[in-house]
């Protein structure tokens, strides 16, 4: 266990040298800022009961656009950096001299991806609170942060199949980024077409699956959500864990 923790620390040091952790944190503000401005328009405010309800709407939009669209791209790019850095620096021979198995090295990299996913989701939630507190009524932070953590874990787990493709079939960072963008657009398109696509396809894609689950979870926690059109599409937490666990 100590060796694994040391490996995780080493992987973070690699990202720190590239200043990517700071970029991930700044990226968390990419969607909350414009969405918060959008929420202040009269056309948007009249759709909500009060400012607390509008804050729920802002959080839901950040969850859908900021996290579930942007996070797979970030995870894919970070994975490419972590798995390609030994190749780029020609340090494979150095790793082979260390008494560590390939499984330990790969596990450490995957743990870093999950931590990055959770950190990004928490940062996005904090950004939503910071930009929303000036015009909306902020409340329910404990639940929203917990939901963001769950979403980060689920989205990262669902992105692991993409990482396999990136690592084994991609040879350049540009192709990796394009592949991640395509993957995110594919998932978001499927989510938008939920009323036209079979349930099986929607549940096999991590973003629609997580979107439907999070919508149902927010509804159960008293957040005003119109889920009439999603009837029959909302999975249980056990089903989400089972499906994403198989994917991962």
Listing of model-derived features with the role each one plays in the protein:
Residues 41-58, 177, 185-248:
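Terminal transmembrane helical anchor/hairpin motif
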Residues 102-126, 193-211:
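Hydrophobic alpha-helical transmembrane segments of integral membrane proteins
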Residues 27-77, 107-173, 229-237:
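Secretory targeting signals
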Residues 1-29:
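Aromatic- and glycine-rich beta-strand/loop motifs that create alpha-glucan
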Residues 30-36, 125, 182-192, 209-210:
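Aromatic-anchored segments of alpha-helical transmembrane domains
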Residues 81-114:
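Helix-loop-helix units of permease transmembrane domains in multi-pass membrane transporters
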Residues 14, 84, 95-97, 166-170:
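Helix-capping/transition residues at the boundaries of transmembrane alpha-helices
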